[in-house]
């Protein structure tokens, strides 16, 4: 039942188009889930959703970014084909032959303008989106310059495995939503922040942390794994438990926050792994440099094929991340 409930939430969240800078729909979906479980809800100027459980103890910030990678229309030619640029870390190798979906429901196919002899020469600038329009005028009735689209990848549950687009980071959002619902009592004052624009530079977390000025911050996000044939050697694997971040390219996690997370896991027999991510950053990267310095750390959900339409994770890792977060902040 626990896995079914979590999968339903994941399916709901991952099915929403929420490319960086366009997080309105996922934000409203999260509000609908948590509005009866917190003392205060507000949306700041940048678009971060901040939900507060009031208390007199430590001020704790829990962050999970709402946005996903995607593409933005930059040009429409006379035949109705769309040129685009990446929003966030879009892999050119994962684009060709994929479907993309716009916020208004329009779906297009991504393809290449010429025969490709060598994949090393693959360029986003030579790709286009076909939405079935026969002219520029017809295309403009369907989409416009500046419109964004996400990749299509419906959530599928297979045993303990979930496969979907946007597990980065709708899985983190789902973990925080479940933690809000399960956290019955705490003396701490907890600011649950669903941040915007993480994929384009950790932007929302920075402004939210500056306004909240928490005593500590814990982010919930995904991390890469080292358990597939092509992967770089890495200790983290799917099914091994949530990962406690040691460092990535944007942050060396504060030792006291890491200690809090490790001790919470050990005390409650929650399996965990230690994460050292050599590429990529996360919200603690901007949080820890804000307001004079904020002790920051992260719980990471191991995900294979990050930034692809087939991101793959373990449901047990996701559910154990909920347990770890609740124990760490209560």
From Swiss-Prot:
It comes from Acetivibrio thermocellus (Hungateiclostridium thermocellum). Disulfide bonds: none annotated. It comes from the Bacteria. Keywords: Aminopeptidase, Hydrolase, Metal-binding, Metalloprotease, Protease. Belongs to the peptidase M42 family. This is Putative aminopeptidase. It holds the Pfam family Peptidase_M42. The active site is at residue 198. One of its GO terms (biological process) is proteolysis. Binds 2 divalent metal cations per subunit. Coiled coil: none annotated. GO terms for molecular function: aminopeptidase activity; metal ion binding; metallopeptidase activity. Its EC number is 3.4.11.-. A divalent metal cation 2 binds at residues 168, 199, 307. Its cofactor is a divalent metal cation. SUPFAM superfamilies: Aminopeptidase/glucanase lid domain, Zn-dependent exopeptidases. A divalent metal cation 1 binds at residues 65, 168, 221.
């Amino acid at each position: 039942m626990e896995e079914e409930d979590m999968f339903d939430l994941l399916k709901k969240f991952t099915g929403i188009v929420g490319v960086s800078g366009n997080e309105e729909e996922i934000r409203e979906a999260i509000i609908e889930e948590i509005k009866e479980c917190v003392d205060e809800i507000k949306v700041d100027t940048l678009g971060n959703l901040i939900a507060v459980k009031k208390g007199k103890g430590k001020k704790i910030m829990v962050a999970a970014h709402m946005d996903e990678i995607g593409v933005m229309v930059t040009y429409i030619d006379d035949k109705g084909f769309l040129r685009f640029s990446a929003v966030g870390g879009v892999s050119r190798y994962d684009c060709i032959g994929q479907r993309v979906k716009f916020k208004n429901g329009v779906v297009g196919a991504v393809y290449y303008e010429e025969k490709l002899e060598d994949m090393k020469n693959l360029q986003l600038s030579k790709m286009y989106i076909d939405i079935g329009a026969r002219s520029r005028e017809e295309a403009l009735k369907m989409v416009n310059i500046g419109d964004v689209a996400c990749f299509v990848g419906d959530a599928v549950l297979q045993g303990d495995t979930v496969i979907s687009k946007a597990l980065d980071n709708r899985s983190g959002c789902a973990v925080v939503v479940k933690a809000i619902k399960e956290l019955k009592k705490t003396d701490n004052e907890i600011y649950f922040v669903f941040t915007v624009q993480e994929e384009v530079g950790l932007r929302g977390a920075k402004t939210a942390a500056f306004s909240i000025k928490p005593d500590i911050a814990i982010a919930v996000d995904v991390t890469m794994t080292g358990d597939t044939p092509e992967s770089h050697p890495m200790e983290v694997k799917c099914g091994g438990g949530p990962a406690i971040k040691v460092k990535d390219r944007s942050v060396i996690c504060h030792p006291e926050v890491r200690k809090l997370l490790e001790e919470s896991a050990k005390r409650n027999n929650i399996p965990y792994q230690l994460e050292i991510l050599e590429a990529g950053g996360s919200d603690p990267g901007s949080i820890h440099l804000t307001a004079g310095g904020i002790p920051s750390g992260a719980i990471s959900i191991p995900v294979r094929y990050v930034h692809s339409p087939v991101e793959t994770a373990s449901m047990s890792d996701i559910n154990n991340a909920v347990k770890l977060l609740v124990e760490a902040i209560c």
